[in-house]
Amino acid sequence: MQNRGFTYGDALFDVLKFEAGNVTFLDDHYIRLMSSMRMLRMKIPSHFTLEGYEKELMKTLEANGLKDSARLRVSVFRTGGGHYLPESNQSEYLVDAEKIPDAADSPYEIELFKDYHVSSGLLSTVKTNNRMVNILGSIFAQENDFQNAILINERKELVGATDSNLFLIKQNRIITPSLDSGCINGIVRRKVLEHLRKSEGRVVEETAVSPFELLKVDEVFLTNSILGIQSVDRYRKKNFTDSVAREVRLELGM
């Protein structure tokens, strides 16, 4: 097998949302994908322009008969063989599309996943195919009747949920794990931060966050490209409000 995405996890991916005839935040996703490929020393094909990228996404949606909302996944992998040292840095890609299932209407409860940790540092901000901690955290959440699990790094700092970035609200303070924690450099995370920084009277902090903060804050919400903004209802015995999440969701049209 010559696909290095299978043999070494030598691949990255992105997830995009198609809705109302458009791919949400397409430009931002494209720029992040190009940046991630450069970071992983993958050569970018000359035809991989923004226009060409959008055309491939739309072609995949059409081939799958998806005209309403859909989840798109773009997988990019290094081509050729080799072992840890690749024979080539050329890259190829695959595009998958599927219908977005209806959201569950049950209370959204989270719990810490402490069996394994995410590595801090900038490499973890890239969506590589090495997602084993996220997978095990998702299994843990399902087996224990939680809607999601919160991951930590080797410094025992909060990183994010298994599939999303994490925001905590305490009065006028907006707190989210910094990129150095190992959280994904999320597109919706960035949009939310941009919006909240324009709000008067609020202090926005990208910083190291202790798990103990989850029991001290007023509100918790998660962000990703498919969910948009997901309010968290409960963590252990702590119930949360959702006023900031509702405000940002309205302002960003999510």
Spans of model-derived segments:
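Helix-start/capping segments and mature chain N-termini
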Residues: 1-59, 82-254
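Ordered, amphipathic secondary-structure segments that act as subunit-interaction surfaces
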Residues: 64-76
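Low-complexity, Lys/Gly-biased intrinsically disordered segments
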Residues: 75-83
